[in-house]
Amino acid sequence: MGPKFGTSGLRGLATELVGSVSALYATAFSRMLLDRGRVAPGATVLVGRDFRDSSSEIAAICMAALARAGMVPVDCGGLPTPALALYGRKLGAASLMITGSHIPADRNGIKFYLPDGEINKADEQAITALAEQLSADADATRVECGRGADHSSEATDFYIQRYETLLPKSGLKGLKIGLYQHSSVARDILTTILEGHGANVVPVGRSEVFIPVDTEAISAATCKMLAAWAKEFAFDAIVSSDADADRPLLTDETGTPLRGDLLGLICARLLEAKLIATPITSNSGIEAASGVEVVRTRVGSPYVIAAMTEAVARGKQRVMGFEANGGVMLGSNFSFGGASLPALPTRDCVLPIIAALHMAVEAKTPLSGIVAMHRLPVALSGRIENYPFDRSDALVAFLKASKANVSHLFSRIGRVAGTDDVDGLRLTFEGGRILHIRPSGNAPELRCYVEADDPDAAEHLLAQGLAVLNSSMV
């Protein structure tokens, strides 16, 4: 199976994207922009990238293709996806972000942005159709490396400026924060922003070899490493992100990661959001805990953004969205503490990190205390890697076909009281435990999300769910 659009962007094997596929899709994107009148011939198109080995070459291939299509490519270098999107909004320019986000190192991807933000599902279909039409065009598929004017400093600085005045200069004073740098494009930017608000930042775990970090399914080895750092350095928190810095990672003082949907909820409270858009996989306690209107969507930023756009069209103000991975999106303009935060409808890791740290400082309590204050159902998630797309699709289809199939497969866990198939299949067992399975849209993986009343019950349910799914012969 070749590269295809997943939950956010085009994804595929790096060996496939380093070649004609990237040229083809960059050309198709240019054609869509021109055909729809979103840009004029000769328009600027920004290109950014993460630190994967293949990203620089894919970016160069895309820049050459953009130039052949009549665009003017601008090289923004290695920077966070939200930084690229923000700079694109400032310039009124479309953009391409070369990143595979959190997926394994042998894969990569391309995220596409219109001048006002991330493309939607209809745009993805249009780009795919144009790519099919252009696939036999030698010019559209030509592989050559191009260049663009260097705007890396301008784009990065503009993103840092967004958060410079969000908190007082001493807003994080007194915190000793570990920064797990690995191969995140935000590793130096986070240092600048956190130190700018008074935090003592200690870098750990920097790597020149790409390390995929999935903030929604943190490995046991990574959790052990985080806990060891927290103890060794007496950190108040450890912060990090995935590869392209649109998903945050934040731990408490023990090195225990905070759930991404909790970070989103904290952010919503800090900014006094009036409407939250979030996928069905986010914690079921969000509605009660937030006290505001919550719109549930399918998994994927395009669906969350569509819900925010619809809410703004209805006249709603202070609209924001977040996913279970912690990426926060602002659908409308916000203000906080005298600072303005213009809308940025793409996932961002910095805002939720700052929000949670600031809440801890203001409450004069460790982050573990902030978690306890929110009293959400205990939610965990995991995944089965190298789970073929066709196998996961067949499994979900089998389960959706009849209640008997569901009961047969999950009888060892308990009696299923209800199901929801908005995205994958969500099972509610008698007693209120929840198990949600869905195929990943980005990699050959099967995702499993659970909720229960206490940590032990949640861990047991997750282990049971993964065991059942692993042994399924469907």
From Swiss-Prot:
InterPro entries membership: A-D-PHexomutase_a/b/a-I (IPR005844), A-D-PHexomutase_a/b/a-I/II/III (IPR016055), A-D-PHexomutase_a/b/a-II (IPR005845), A-D-PHexomutase_a/b/a-III (IPR005846), A-D-PHexomutase_C (IPR005843), A-D-PHexomutase_C_sf (IPR036900), A-D-PHexomutase_CS (IPR016066), Phosphoglucosamine_mutase (IPR050060)
Alphabetical list of CDD domains matching this protein: ManB
SUPFAM superfamilies for the chain: Phosphoglucomutase, C-terminal domain (SSF55957), Phosphoglucomutase, first 3 domains (SSF53738)
Cofactor descriptive note: Binds 1 Mg(2+) ion per subunit.
Class of the enzyme per the UniProt entry, highest EC level: isomerase
Binding site residues for Mg(2+): S101, D242, D244, D246
Pfam family, one: PGM_PMM_IV
Enzyme Commission numbers on file: 5.4.2.8
Active site: S101
Catalyzed reaction equations: alpha-D-mannose 1-phosphate = D-mannose 6-phosphate
Cofactor or coenzyme needed: Mg(2+)
Signal sequence interval, chain numbering: none
GO biological process: carbohydrate metabolic process
Domain of life: Bacteria
UniProt keyword terms in alphabetical order: Isomerase, Magnesium, Metal-binding, Nodulation, Phosphoprotein, Plasmid
Coiled-coil residue windows: none
Molecular functions per Gene Ontology: magnesium ion binding; phosphomannomutase activity
Keyword Phosphoprotein: yes
Family statement: Belongs to the phosphohexose mutase family.
Protein's name in the database: Phosphomannomutase
Organism: Sinorhizobium fredii (strain NBRC 101917 / NGR234)
